[in-house]
From Swiss-Prot:
The keyword Secreted applies. This is Alpha/kappa-conotoxin pl14a. Expressed by the venom duct. The keyword Lyase does not apply.
């Protein structure tokens, strides 16, 4: 059974790639006229990544607190 951290990481990666593929104005994306493309806001991605302890892997996320060396969680 996959761990919560690996599932969270996979979900975050999937969301990031999805957002990148549907960003308006990027070349090669198919868009329906009159429809807004769905976006997943960066603050929400960063919040989830920071809580999961993997925020340091995303260059646009600036997690507050230090990594706890014993439990590998974020200390706030």
């Amino acid at each position: 059974m996959p761990s919560v951290r690996s599932v969270t990481c996979c979900c975050l990666l999937w969301m990031m790639f999805s957002v990148q593929l549907v960003t308006p104005g990027s070349p090669g994306t198919a868009q329906l006229s009159g429809h807004r493309t769905a976006r997943f806001p960066r603050p929400r991605i960063c919040n989830l990544a920071c809580r999961a302890g993997i925020g340091h892997k995303y260059p646009f996320c600036h997690c507050r607190g230090k990594r706890d060396a014993v439990s590998s969680s974020m200390a706030v």
